[in-house]
Regions:
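Extended, folded cores of ATP/NTP-driven motor/assembly subunits in large transport
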Residues: 1-378
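P-loop NTPase motor domains
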Residues: 23, 30-49, 56, 60, ...
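Hydrophobic anchor at the beta1->P-loop junction of P-loop NTPases
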Residues: 415
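Conserved lysine of the Walker
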Residues: 423
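Hydrophobic positions on the alpha1 helix immediately C-terminal to the Walker A/P-loop
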Residues: 426
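Post-Walker A helix-loop "phosphate-sensing" segment adjacent to the P-loop in P-loop NTPases
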Residues: 433-443
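A short helix-turn-beta junction within AAA+ P-loop NTPase domains corresponding to the substrate/partner-engaging
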Residues: 459-463, 673-686
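Conserved P-loop NTPase
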Residues: 701-756
Length: 765
């Protein structure tokens, strides 16, 4: 093995390995399946007779501790450790429902004959580039393994019973006099019996697949890989030279015709009809002609396939059960799984991803027959970074979905769903998860006063803004880091234009003259503060109102008159300097009591306050999560929608992770500009949708009818997750017996049950 990933398997045979990820094949509708199948056929046809390749599907059981470590939330020695322990326990119980106990990986190993490493390298590199490009065309993520990664993979396959890490350095080879084999070899190998083998404390058995079925099914490989036990499936494929293949088939047809003539002569001599020939002969002749036609005119190639299945277990009894289960799957598709008696060692070595086949049992198949073993089943999303968040279980495989939105190109997100679909619950669960596993600040715009209990439980701050409240937010607040530009006033002016449009603008919004006047006045009222930026010099809405009154244009007087009720009238809640200290890590702006007139203005002012916080946090290299409930309210007016879209675009660069929560998809797509919110959101958590919204979303997000069924009349907590280019159906059955569930549920039945339990406890006391 060489550091760059090239392995010299024999004196003149060199191989490399590429690891590839899964894509959703079984979830797709028939047209998409056909497209993937055709793409896979083209992929296989790339390999000529000089390239041998091996597809390896490795499902190895991980110890419980391995997964426990990957999902455990580290304790931080504060009063929330009890909640962290409970959340970790919830994740472990969810994990037990699926088969995440298996680590499933897929590899393609390819090799060429060459006189030397120097001659092999350029060929392998060219083939590697072509393979990665072919995977990319299929929408499959793939990467080449270096020497260390290939050795780690082999070490894992040869030490299935030991959780010990792989320890190796290229610098150790020369001083020790050892080879790479010494660092990956298991403690013991045993090939005493002809029907099984031992590796370490595990026992295994290698079988080969006899393909007897006249037609193959694309579910067969998927069914093997769905087995809930350790398993290695290895497919060695060798392309046959096209000219040789056609010559061989023509020769066979000639032989069959010769035999047919002999049978006809025999029939004439015996005195019966010469058309009566053995049925097998007629069948073989027809099949051979059909095969020749496929090779000559249907872009098919001829391949030789060796299909090996390695079952591994802790003891002989379990191994017998696993082998029986694998055999049953083969029989279901009219094939047979046969043990490689007295060839267990050769079989196991051939199953290792080295691209070297020692089993000379090959079956000739055309491109489409080999391609029917589609190597794609169901995509999984299990990221084990320290900021990965729980999103439910994969509805197809029952495996945990854990994702880190910050790894996306654009972490902005949307939570969409009809009332009662679990929208608010999902948002609260994510907020709690973010609080427990990250150091990010969390800000919530809460138009319906739903988030208070959760925020208070997390020792956060609820800022109640209403006409009767004494909590004030100044919409004129300006942080000197407000914008990337040298002049922070440009973006602030945009915000004030949006605010004035909500207050003044009619059906057509602000007129160009009105926008000019407002912009002029904004620059004037900030002049003193920008020359001496002290808090007491921060302008308020009344300063803007007075400046407008000083202008000569009649439009200025019109705008000032419209502002009057918000300055000196009964709606003057936003005509004060900010008196709330929003430095708490979790802050919720409760604007429920603002009333219809002020609610949209309140949401816009909150958005501006959040932007101020984001700019401050950016200086401290800290992320800010912002959750906007009832987001559609901000998108109805053109200017506020434009400002929201602008902020949505800017958030990513400034370390912000915004999440819009809404049931009104139509408002999200009401204009081309607002569609930018979808285009700038790589994370969409979609719950049950109304029929009109489903059609809009299907078109916007290119969702197939089959995928759409997961958000049609779906139960609470069920839907589709869009994470970058990945689309997964999910189910979130959050345990109801947890403290966290009681804090975040909004269902009246659950809340009344809690009240009843509390009353019982009081009576008992």
């Amino acid at each position: 093995m060489y550091p760059d990933g090239v392995c010299r398997v024999t004196d003149n045979y060199y191989t490399k390995t590429v690891q590839f990820q899964d894509i959703n094949y079984q979830l797709n509708q028939n047209e998409d399946k056909t497209a993937i199948f055709d793409g896979w056929c083209d992929f296989l046809n790339y390999f000529d007779s000089s390239i041998r390749f091996q597809l390896s599907f490795i499902n190895l059981s991980a110890t419980r501790d391995t997964y426990a470590r990957r999902i455990a939330i580290p304790l931080q020695g504060d009063c929330f450790d009890k909640l962290r322990t409970e959340y970790t326990g919830m994740l472990q119980s969810q994990l037990a429902r699926g088969n995440n106990g298996l680590i499933k990986t897929k590899y393609l190993t390819f090799g060429v004959e060459a006189d030397s490493l120097k001659a092999a390298k350029p060929r392998l590199e060219r083939i590697e580039t072509d393979i990665l490009n072919n995977f990319r065309r299929l929408g499959v993520q793939a990467e080449s393994l270096n020497g260390m990664e290939r050795l780690r993979l082999l070490h894992g396959m040869l030490h299935m019973d030991e959780p010990q890490p792989f320890r190796f350095s290229w610098d150790w080879l020369a001083p020790s006099g050892l080879s790479v084999k010494d660092f990956i070899a298991p403690g013991a190998f045993e090939f005493k019996t002809g029907s099984s083998f031992g590796v370490g404390s595990k026992t295994g058995c290698v079988s080969f697949l006899q393909i007897l079925a006249p037609e193959l099914n694309d579910r067969m490989l998927a069914d093997f890989l769905d087995m809930e036990s350790s398993l290695i499936v290895s497919m060695h494929v060798q392309s046959v030279d096209q000219v040789k293949a056609i010559k061989t088939i023509k020769r066979k047809i000639t032989d069959l015709q010769k035999m047919t003539i002999e049978e006809q002569k025999k029939a004439v001599r015996s005195g019966y009809d010469m058309d009566i020939i053995p049925s097998d002969l007629a069948t073989y002749g027809t099949e051979a002609k059909k095969l020749l036609q496929e090779l000559q005119s249907r872009n098919e190639r001829m391949f030789l396939l060796t299909f090996l299945v390695v079952n591994v277990a802790d003891n002989k009894q379990r191994l017998g059960n696993n082998v029986f289960q694998a055999g049953s799957i083969a029989q279901k598709y009219n094939c047979q799984l046969t043990r490689l008696d007295f060839q267990q060692e050769e079989g196991f070595m051939s199953a290792l991803p080295l691209g070297y086949n020692q089993i000379e049992i090959q079956r000739g198949l055309t491109t489409s027959s080999v391609a029917i073993f589609v190597p794609f089943t169901t995509q999984e999303l299990f990221q084990d970074g320290k900021e990965a968040l729980y999103c439910g279980l994969n509805a197809l495989s029952n495996n945990l979905i854990m994702v880190d939105r910050k790894l996306l190109k654009n972490p902005n997100g949307l939570i969409l769903g009809t009332p009662g679909s679990g929208k608010s619950f999902s948002a609260k669960r994510e907020i709690a998860n973010v609080f427990l596993v990250t150091n990010d600040d969390i800000i919530i715009c809460d138009p319906e006063a739903e988030y208070g209990p959760l925020v208070e439980h997390l020792h956060g701050q609820v800022v109640k803004i209403s006409p009767t409240s004494t909590d004030y937010l100044n919409p004129m607040d300006l942080n000197l880091n407000y914008s990337d530009d040298e002049n922070p006033l440009s973006l602030k002016s945009d915000f004030i234009l949006s605010l004035c449009e909500l207050i003044v603008g009619g059906k057509d919004g602000l007129m160009p003259v009105e926008k000019t006047i407002i912009d002029r006045c904004v620059r004037s009222v900030y002049r003193e503060y920008l020359s001496d930026p002290r808090p007491e010099k921060m302008p308020i809405l009344e300063d803007l109102y007075n400046e407008l009154r000083r202008q000569d244009e009649k439009e200025a007087q019109y705008i000032a008159t419209a502002l009057e009720i918000y300055v000196t009238g009964s709606l003057n809640v936003f005509n004060h300097r900010s008196n709330v200290n929003i430095e708490n890590r979790v802050v919720s702006f409760d604007i429920k009591e603002l009333g219809k007139q002020l609610k949209k203005i309140g949401m816009l002012v909150v958005q501006d306050a959040v932007w101020n916080r984001v700019t401050i946090n950016r200086e401290q290299r800290k992320s800010t999560r912002y959750y906007i409930d009832e987001m559609h309210l901000l998108l109805k007016e053109e200017q506020t929608a434009a400002y929201t879209v602008e902020i949505w675009k800017r958030f990513r660069k400034w370390g912000g992770v915004p999440t819009g929560i809404t049931q009104n998809v139509k408002d999200l797509l009401s204009s081309r500009e607002v569609e930018n919110i979808f285009e700038n959101s790589d994370y969409v958590y979609m719950l049950n949708q109304a029929s009109g919204d489903r059609q809009i979303l299907a078109k916007q997000l290119n969702i197939s009818p089959h995928q759409l069924s997961y958000v049609t009349q779906s139960a609470e907590g069920e839907g589709l997750l869009f994470y970058g280019s990945v689309i997964l159906p999910f189910v979130d059955r959050f345990p109801k017996d947890t403290e966290l569930y009681k804090i975040i549920t909004t269902k009246l039945s659950d809340l009344s049950e809690q009240t009843g339990e509390e009353a019982k406890d009081a009576i008992t006391v």
